[in-house]
Amino acid sequence: MKPCETVSQLSTVAINGWDLQKALRLLHSSNPTLFEWNNSPIVYKTTPEWAEISSIIGHFFQKKAGLYHYLSTAKKNYREYLKGDMVKLKKYFYVLRPILACRWILEKQTPPPMLFSTLAEACLDEALVPAVTDL
């Protein structure tokens, strides 16, 4: 029987993780979620081994895989969240963030940052920054 590749625990705090074998397989295929986890500004626990992997992870980033992932996410979220009459404000960000991530990848050729504010400052047209910030 194949061991579980994903660690999940639901309680007051949501804990998620992958075993090393799965993480390395996802890294090899340039899975954007792994890059997001690596770029997260919030780290509760790490290890020296992960610090080593983290230092080279950017070399495995494939622009095409990242663009496909974020564009697909934006399209899916648009169809799912923005087609109704009443749209919750935060749902716009579910479409805007992956679009900005695509722009980041095209301009910088690196995985996009996790923080929306960093993406917005770097990728939004200057005239749009105040409007999005006000949201």
Model-derived regions: residue spans:
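Conserved catalytic core of two-metal-ion nucleotidyltransferases
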Residues: 2-82, 89-92
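Conserved nucleotidyltransferase catalytic core and NTase-mimicking acidic/glycine-rich helix/loop elements
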Residues: 54-135
